[in-house]
Amino acid sequence: MASSAREHLLFVRRRNPQMRYTLSPENLQSLAAQNSMPENMALQRANSDTDLVTSESRSSLTASMYEYTLGQAQNLIIFWDIKEEVDPSDWIGLYHIDENSPANFWDSKNRGVTGTQKGQIVWRIEPGPYFMEPEIKICFKYYHGISGALRATTPCITVKNPAVMMGAEGMEGGASGSLHSRKLVSFTLSDLRAVGLKKGMFFNPDPYLKMSIQPGKKSSFPTCAHHGQERRSTIISNTTNPIWHREKYSFFALLTDVLEIEIKDKFAKSRPIIKRFLGKLTIPVQRLLERQAGDQMLSYNLGRRLPADHVSGYLQFKVEVTSSAHEDASPEAVGTILGVHTVNGDLGSPSDEEDMPGSHHDSTICANGPVSEDSVADGTPKHSFRTSSTLEIDTEDLISTSSRNSPPRGRQDSLNDYLDAIEHNGPARPGAASSSERSMGASPKLRSSFPTDTRLNAMLHIDSDEEDHEFQQDLGYPSSLEEEGGLIMCSRASRIDDGSLTSQTKPEDDNPVENEDASIHETASLEERLENLPEVADGSLPSSTAPDENEANLEPQPSADQGSTELCSSQEVDQPTSGADAGASDTSGGSRRAASETESLDQGSEPSQVSSETEPSDPARTESVSEASTRPEGESDPEGADSSCNESVTTQLSSVETRCSSLESARFPETPAFSSQEEEDGACAAEPTSSGPAEGSQESVCTPSSLPAVQVPSREEEGSAAEAAALSEQGELGEVWQRRGSLEGAAAAAPAAAATDSQPQEDGDAGDAQGACEGATAQEEGATGGSQTNGHQPLRSLPSVRQDVSRYQRVDEALPPNWEARIDSHGRIFYVDHVNRTTTWQRPTAPPAPQVLQRSNSIQQMEQLNRRYQSIRRTMTNERPEENTSAIDGAGEEADFHQASADFRRENVLPHSTSRSRLTLLLQSPPVKFLISPEFFTVLHSNPSAYRMFTNNTCLKHMITKVRRDTHHFERYQHNRDLVGFLNMFANKQLELPRGWEMKHDHQGKAFFVDHNSRTTTFIDPRLPLQSSRPTSALVHRQHLTRQRSHSAGEVGEDSRHAGPPVLPRPSSTFNTVSRPQYQDMVPVAYNDKIVAFLRQPNILEILQERQPDLARNHSLREKIQFIRTEGTPGLVRLSSDADLVMLLSLFEEEIMSYVPPHALLHPSYCQSPRGSPVSSPQNSPGTQRANARAPAPYKRDFEAKLRNFYRKLETKGYGQGPGKLKLIIRRDHLLEDAFNQIMGYSRKDLQRNKLYVTFVGEEGLDYSGPSREFFFLVSRELFNPYYGLFEYSANDTYTVQISPMSAFVDNHHEWFRFSGRILGLALIHQYLLDAFFTRPFYKALLRILCDLSDLEYLDEEFHQSLQWMKDNDIHDILDLTFTVNEEVFGQITERELKPGGANIPVTEKNKKEYIERMVKWRIERGVVQQTESLVRGFYEVVDARLVSVFDARELELVIAGTAEIDLNDWRNNTEYRGGYHDNHIVIRWFWAAVERFNNEQRLRLLQFVTGTSSIPYEGFASLRGSNGPRRFCVEKWGKITALPRAHTCFNRLDLPPYPSFSMLYEKLLTAVEETSTFGLE
């Protein structure tokens, strides 16, 4: 029997002798046959490498044991050691030992973005459809995701199933009797169309179809002459939704054959297509003929071949049978032929998981677990659970809904022979309604954490199995049983179609209750049930058991065998038994399965897509996608489980519609379902398919879909109205679909499950882990079930990390259409606009108002790109004080000066939210003002107890340093006990409380303070010193107190404009000395230079010790002073955040300011303010103050020399000199696509040598550098846009970006990073600046410089803080650490050693430095090593590494991105005038007044409008470049006063008409800057 079953399970193929590292089957069988030998002797020879001599150089895959018994407690552990290249898309598959095809895996796991070349995971094997024999031999194989190459294979592993009785003969008896029709059938496919095909990052495919007829997979099916028929469609250009008009394809086939359809992308030399495969269907001809019904359109979701494939979309077509084989076949054969296909799920909708190679076909598959023959004979499943179902069954609908569900293709192929045997075993019952038969089958399970979305695979893969396991235990389910089910049972109310089946269903049967009682009270043991599994026949529903309009509420009998009952029932399909519908209200099943419904957050089981027939006439009938199952740790997700949902036939009372599990099903009647990211989100989008008349039922077929969210807008975009309608429907529903996503409500749901009356909405709320269907952006911890939508369109739900989701409050208000909320890898919520392809940190509250002006696509794009980085504040100065500070009483000019840019981003677009205003007020509170005051350290010195606390408490020092650097940190630290105690030491209890403050006492008598201004409470006493208003000039004081900051350092906040390259010395007015307003004019020395000069005095230590006697004993501080004396300004920059040094220097403020170096007069250049050290008068308004630079300027003369030398060498080596041209013809609306195609098409030599020439299509302007500059501006804003998934925002701010670990899941990502590197290189050699902001480690990576601990702060601030604390403190007996880190690999949290044997090496005070270095390396490189290598490779394809190596990271940042700060004085001083204008002309004065009134973003846009880029060179406006070298900003008197100003970007010239009034000039200039963006010829 076992061998017979084995024969039906799969036909044995000989293994490919070229398969690497694998023992041959003969050897493996001989090893297994040596039963007489001791077991360990066989194990000694087990090795995955046939070359035992040099195995160290080969990849290996091994297992912890080679005999595994199902159900045993011991885990099977798989170890890998891969010597070749690895990739995040690598996967390990479980195969039968004789399987050669990579696609025929039984289970698989994807690696994910972390993981290394060595590791291990636990693999739990459960009794299932593949292990129906006493012994089965399997192996595991490791495949490289990108190339598909087999890396390693385990030796043979024998899996024993003690539950299967050796003598089971159920299959044999029936199998021999099956007859197959040998008559050919002719059919025609027409009206073929595909919807939502996968596209490249920016390219639409050119799809075509390959169709062929192949023999059925079973070995008994013959290969005939007609096999191999192949048809090819025409190629449809540039579309993801091809329609093959007027094309028909005819085929001849046996009923046992399969039709294979593959969609491919036409090969195009002009663009790099790495994978041309777009999706595949393998449809049994029988199923196809069953589903064809007149003119109705069949719809099948496309499947994939391997877990690493990216597939989306579905295929639709009509089938017309031109000649049928049925009349010549015997009745028995016809019954078998037709009956076989009512098995749950249509093979034609292959799982997204498995698009099969051409040689593998499938037959039918059972879905949930077989039901024994005797129970079928009664018309009830043997292990029924409590059900309630009423009404007549629409058999035709059974066919359609049955075929909607797609079992997994591929891994089920090797199962198909077994299933075929099942199908043909049971004799077809005469008179049976074959179209309503429901055969039960087990469904294979897979876990795949591989996202298939091609554009936004950007989120987290955190394993949540442990929590799922806990939920199951909490609910009292044995976790092992939870796995068995495989399928989610969905109820479906079928509409009655009298014409289709009247003769096949008997209207009544009075015995359903007795039948079911009998079946339910059977308590067969687990072994009996497993033994009976193979005996399942098709389960025809006899006409004698057609359901009556009665209700049967049957309680399963509790018994000691409850566990086994659960096992089997979870495998059962809800059979349309007499009066009972298990799917509608399966209480025992429902409660048992509830916990297993919710897809673990990031597992990402790749579901088989639910194929859908669409009849456009019915807008109400929809499908929604179901939750998948949650499993205990290490378990495979039921891929098949998710894929083929059983529909129980729940018929309907008149036109009452079955309640959809979530409201969105009613909401999106037209949208083809493309949800995405179920891997990360566990969320499901609706899959609506209209079909049937308007009264038709809705069905809830729930399975996470993995298609990209390319949504067709719904007619019902008014979410609230649709929701109200859906809610009102809820009360009238006759059939309740129990949401199994329920974790909390699962147990409670059981008693009420049988109700056929209306059920309250809370049933959905309890069951729906996402909450209601409104745009739920929060997910409840522990569950992410259910479909989710935001009321407008199915969007991806928050890909949240389960541990963190509780931090985000639930948001019930729907997002506007085409918006989606997400959480980035730092736990911050951001919003994605899918229409404009932008991201924003602010929640969009309503659909945008229609534009008043009709803007061109390019200007809309420019504005969106500007918003994408949240109004990048490179000029970090706020608007004029009167605009910003008037809102707060008594705040003086300083009110908003410490606001971070985030508070004012998009100030002209959206109003501030209440929380934002509250934050604004908080940041202006007395504690913040005190901490950031320039006098803070002076006051600190005068308070000995506070000073002692400050110096002794490193945490306190760290917090104060952070707050002084960026006031936003105060919100985080404000309730810290140390900080509160410290600040209260300065409070003056005698003073009145500030206005709006009130003191209260808690129940313990402790005083606390209420700030009614910001509606906050605090223990910090607001009566702190330094609250008096100060002159405006004081606001630019703090450069010497805080660290030098840069964009790459991720530190540019509003407050950071004080911290840039030296701004202004602290005004002397803050000291009680004579004011020196003209001091800067007399000695224009940058403040840092003054400090260095002061410290370089010969007797400096004596001078310092006079005021700071402790200096003599503080060797560390003395070393720092010596370091600054030696290194100069760069050394001071490095130490600028050192609190001890800052305090020391603050004592000598006056001396430093008054100190004039003796050689200053001899070297005038020493006294000149460098470009990075602007000097402006304290009388200037804050709006005109020089803002922070992107990076602190290095020592100017040295850097300028490097830069000149660099460009000179580029010129001598012929970089970018021609004579050839690098012609780029760019369409604005296809900017990246055109740029990628053309730049990647050039050779390395062409890129280096040729002169760049950019033309925008439709704009006849010549490129005298203006279009080139704009090209780099636009391409950098698009390419580094986090929307596309290549880059992500850094941890510290909302606009600097870094390489995203999730970019590994973007199609062709290595080529895109190469392209990014080439763009960086081209910008460098052609001397253009990029409008992009990167973190410091990015520039270090470009220079191949190792990162250190300080660089980590820009990636992960808290992680850096922890390591910094560890570095600064003695960790002896405090921390219990080893040289290991935890990573998620193949869906499991695994421990990775930072060094060999690291798990056994404790971290001590002696080796902590090495530990910190290794942790920094691991954290910075985590998930981005290969991407970084690709980018660096592209960069050095354009630029010689030796040329760039002269720069450090900070200098390279300046060369690539410029300082992009606007100094109005510098701008005005370096502007030329023509046509009669001069500096004192009234129009010019108005012009500069208008520029001064502009906010920072508008100034940048003006600069971009005139010069083509909003960045300016390091040297300032004097070094602006035009078409043929340096060309200053120019304003020319030209044009009519009715016209707008005009720009000539090639010459940096603005044509400004002589407007008669300031208001007209301001309005026209603003309009020109914000509304225009094209090039033209005069």
Curated annotation (Swiss-Prot):
Per the record, the pathway is: Protein modification; protein ubiquitination
Provide the E.C. number(s) assigned to this enzyme: 2.3.2.26
Query: What is this protein's record name?
Result: E3 ubiquitin-protein ligase HECW2
What spans are recorded as compositionally biased (Basic residues)?
1037-1046
Record keyword Transmembrane present:
no
Residue ranges of coiled coil: 853-880
GO cellular component terms listed in the entry, alphabetical order: cytoplasm; mitotic spindle
Please describe the quaternary structure of this protein. Interacts with TP73. Interacts with FZR1.
Q: Which reaction does this chain catalyze?
A: S-ubiquitinyl-[E2 ubiquitin-conjugating enzyme]-L-cysteine + [acceptor protein]-L-lysine = [E2 ubiquitin-conjugating enzyme]-L-cysteine + N(6)-ubiquitinyl-[acceptor protein]-L-lysine
What is this protein's function per UniProt?
E3 ubiquitin-protein ligase that mediates ubiquitination of TP73. Acts to stabilize TP73 and enhance activation of transcription by TP73. Involved in the regulation of mitotic metaphase/anaphase transition.
Q: Where is the HECT domain?
A: 1243-1578
User: Could you read off the lineage of the organism from its UniProt record?
Assistant: Eukaryota, Metazoa, Chordata, Craniata, Vertebrata
Q: Point out the gene that encodes the protein.
A: Hecw2
Major location category of this protein: cytoplasm
Residue positions of the active site: C1546 (glycyl thioester intermediate)
